[in-house]
């Protein structure tokens, strides 16, 4: 057995009686007052594993005494020797880190070299001479094997994490038991926190490294795919840490999966072919050909015999099966379960039955097709009807450009909002136009609504900003004037609505335009009835459009005329008075001039822009519907 010793020199001046280690007191050490075993928290001979039996080492010296006991009770040394040797540890009351011998004035801590030489020759003499320190060979080996792991005992014991003592070759260096014990206690206490931090760091690093290795291994081994199905791996076993070999075994498994997948696809296709053969053919109408064929002006010629139109012929059954299924055989398509072996045998038996019935089914198909062709009677004339409809639509488009909006059929129709809103209709003529109904692409936008009678009250004369400001002020005897021949042109066939007394109304408009929109070819007609008291005033862009003519349908058509105009009606007929610059005195009596002409010009410009946008939208709609814009322009449609 070898004895390792080290020196801890301390000057005499440093021995302060009030000196105390702050970390070794009971409250700072984290111990209860009833727990006085301080050495037990620093030494753990089992290395925190509990695999070896605990050993008791007496590291306390008989000199650990209270200073008061040291001076007044010299006989306490022997008692300290017996108590510390028998118990293996010392109580807190016996600690004295300042007095190392019976002589308080001793300044040295060295031991006689002759004693060390005797210990080197006869190690057993050390146990007989120094009864305070007794360490056996097995206990010394346990001290050398102390690990840095934290103790796992719950009684507050901690492993001694101080560095192992290094052998010193100089025999002249001795150790003092009191200083050595104090040094061990102090170093263990001070290094406790550092060693705890280091051990926790090692533990975290080791745990993270192990966890990372296991997770990487699992990710490599468990990553599923269509060729390599996932394998059950136990995370705790040692075999799971090794990656799955990817050699001939993996290649063989991949080949087997590919062959199985191809076989299942082939069987699935055969099953689909069998199901198709058992069902009769379906007559599918090709809507694309039916719609596009309508633009052909003429009768269809059937190249197959004339019984059925080619647009309604049955579709051939030569479509490849793999085209009907999206992403067949891809990663998102699940494989068929291998437990369906009985179903596969049944499919093979059905395929054999299919081959026997092919001849009879083909005969049945031909008979069924001929019967289904006969009951649908509209197959032969469908293309002609489509072509006829297209021609009629083109004719109606051409008529809209040159016709005024003559609404006699919709004159009495009241919209849900209570206003008389009409739809543009073609001139009564060919019967093919009457058989058609307008859709969203064939009619122009409707005009603005016309207010009802309760909104058309008589108004006083307005400001000259309404468009009737003129410099030629010729006095007029009365607003009731006879009709001038050049301003009114009643339409032939009128039923007296154009004649009669002309009752004028003080109109504030420079020209009383209709409340409908203007087409590109001229003024448009508005819905009206003989019982209406008047029409709503609209400012006109030019002053030469104030004359009106009444037709037999009750609509009003602007035909051109003199200057500003005012409209009025009442009694049994509808009459109009055309105001001229000579009537300026009547229209501008008591009215101060204003600068509303700018507003008038701005509004007229906005109306013109609105009409232009509507016309462009109509042309775009016609072009989108497949019409010929050039022909429409030739017929009268212009942007």
Curated annotation (Swiss-Prot):
Biased composition (Basic residues): 69-78, 246-255
Record keywords: Activator, Conidiation, Sporulation, Transcription, Transcription regulation, Virulence
Coiled coil: none
Region spans: Disordered: 65-97, 206-369, 418-552, 587-613
Effect of gene knockout: Leads to slower germination, lower hydrophobivity and lower virulence of conidia.
GO biological process: conidium formation; sporulation resulting in formation of a cellular spore
Similarity comment: family membership: Belongs to the wetA family.
Name recorded for this polypeptide: Developmental regulatory protein wetA
Organism: Beauveria bassiana (strain ARSEF 2860) (White muscardine disease fungus)
Name of the encoding gene: wetA
């Amino acid at each position: 057995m070898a004895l390792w010793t080290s020196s801890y020199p301390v000057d005499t001046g440093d021995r302060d009686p009030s000196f105390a280690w702050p970390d070794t007191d009971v409250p700072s050490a984290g111990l209860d007052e009833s727990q006085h075993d301080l050495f037990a928290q620093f030494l753990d001979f089992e290395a925190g594993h509990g695999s070896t039996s605990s050993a008791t080492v007496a590291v306390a010296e008989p000199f650990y005494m209270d200073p008061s006991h040291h001076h007044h009770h010299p006989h306490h040394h022997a008692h300290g020797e017996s108590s510390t040797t028998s118990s293996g540890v010392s109580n807190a009351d016996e600690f004295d880190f300042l007095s190392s011998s019976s002589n308080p004035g001793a300044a040295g801590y060295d031991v006689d070299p002759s004693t060390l030489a005797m210990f080197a020759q006869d190690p057993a003499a050390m146990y007989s001479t120094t009864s305070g320190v007794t360490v056996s060979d097995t206990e010394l080996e346990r001290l050398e094997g102390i690990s840095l792991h934290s103790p796992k005992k719950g009684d507050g014991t901690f492993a001694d994490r101080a560095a192992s003592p290094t052998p010193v070759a100089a025999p002249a260096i001795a150790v003092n038991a009191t200083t050595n014990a104090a040094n061990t206690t102090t170093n263990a206490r001070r290094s406790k926190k550092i060693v705890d931090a280091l051990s926790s760091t090692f533990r975290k690093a080791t745990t993270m490294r192990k966890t990372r290795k296991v997770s990487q291994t699992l990710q490599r081994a468990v990553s599923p795919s269509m060729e390599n199905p996932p394998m059950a791996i136990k995370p705790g076993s040692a075999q799971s840490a090794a990656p799955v070999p990817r050699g001939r075994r993996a290649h063989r498994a991949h080949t087997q999966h590919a062959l199985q997948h191809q076989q299942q696809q082939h069987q699935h296709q055969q099953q689909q072919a069998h199901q198709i053969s058992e069902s009769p053919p379906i007559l599918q109408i090709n809507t694309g050909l039916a719609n596009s064929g309508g633009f052909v002006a003429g009768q269809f010629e059937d190249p197959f015999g004339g019984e059925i139109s080619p647009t309604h012929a049955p579709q051939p059954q030569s479509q490849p099966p793999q085209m009907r299924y999206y992403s067949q055989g891809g990663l998102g398509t699940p494989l068929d379960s291998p437990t369906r072996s009985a179903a596969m045998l049944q499919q093979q038996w059905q395929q054999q039955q299919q081959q026997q019935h092919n001849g009879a089914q083909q005969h049945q198909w031909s008979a069924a097709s001929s019967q289904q062709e006969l009951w649908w009677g509209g197959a032969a004339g469908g293309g002609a009807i489509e072509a006829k409809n297209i021609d009629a639509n083109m004719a109606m488009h051409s008529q809209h450009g040159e016709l005024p909006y003559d609404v006699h059929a919709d004159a009495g129709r009241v919209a849900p909002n209570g206003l008389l809103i009409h739809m543009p209709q073609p001139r009564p003529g060919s019967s093919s136009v009457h058989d058609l109904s307008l859709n969203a692409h064939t009619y122009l936008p409707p005009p603005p609504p016309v207010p009802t009678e309760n909104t058309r009250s008589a108004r006083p004369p307005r400001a000259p900003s309404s468009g009737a400001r003129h410099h030629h002020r010729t006095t007029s005897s009365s607003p009731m004037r006879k009709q001038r021949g050049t301003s009114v042109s009643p339409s032939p066939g009128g039923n007296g609505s154009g004649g009669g007394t002309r009752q004028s109304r003080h109109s504030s408009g420079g020209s009383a335009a209709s409340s409908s929109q203007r087409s590109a070819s001229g003024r448009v007609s508005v819905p009206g009835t003989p019982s209406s008291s008047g029409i709503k005033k609209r400012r006109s862009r030019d002053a030469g459009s104030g004359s009106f003519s009444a037709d037999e349908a009750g609509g009003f058509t602007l035909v051109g005329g003199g200057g500003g105009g005012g409209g009025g009606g009442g009694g049994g007929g509808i009459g109009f008075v055309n105001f001229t610059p000579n009537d300026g005195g009547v229209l501008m009596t008591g009215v101060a001039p204003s600068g509303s002409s700018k507003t008038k010009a701005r509004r007229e410009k906005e109306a013109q822009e609105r009409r232009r946008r509507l016309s462009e939208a109509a042309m775009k709609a016609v072009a989108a519907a497949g019409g010929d814009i050039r022909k429409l322009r030739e017929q009268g449609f212009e942007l």
